[in-house]
Amino acid sequence: MSIDGQTDSRMPRYSFAGDPVTYVVPTLIDLDELGFRLARAARASGIPLETTVVISNGALPYSTSVHNHLGNDGKIITIGMSYYDFDRVRQRAEVVQDLSDEVVGKAVFLLDEVVDRGGTMPVAIDHILTSGARSVHTGALIFKRRSVFVPDFVGESIDDEWVVFPHDIRPSIERISSKWRDLGVNEAEIRTRFHRLFERAPHLVEQVIHYHSLVPA
């Protein structure tokens, strides 16, 4: 069961001249709302809910909220997944940090902040089941429709858009700044674009401008 097809998104899309990418910038309020939607659907489905496992690092900032909305007991368990081996991209995701606690006999709810291409969760599910879990159900705050894997529960589905998460400001700004400069966008226009991107989260503007200023011209 998923809650795909939501039409009441509060997250506007942003596009800019000369840049083919569409950006989505969820606020902390948006993400808490998506976590609540996801958890409410999971609880209503009647699946067994006992233990939350979160894929680190991306989902960690939102895991406590979802864990509490689910009504799961005990501490949150983490598992580290990655496609990267230093500067080399692996063919498939691998477990790079084992489960932080035992899951033997547990009904696990596996959480990630975004499912993009869908290669991470299946590997994590296999590892959790091999580690003795009784069952695994999955949830993602944001799901990209291009993914080959569909989680059981989804906060919101989007197209192939660049999601800038609040926890990911520095690396996102560094990449976007470099990209826009390479496209020939002047500094004044870059600042204007960033102000537009983060108009719904004005407390982040100072961070954005600071990190942009650190990117070599």
Predicted regions and their residues:
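PRPP-associated nucleotide enzymes
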Residues: 1-217
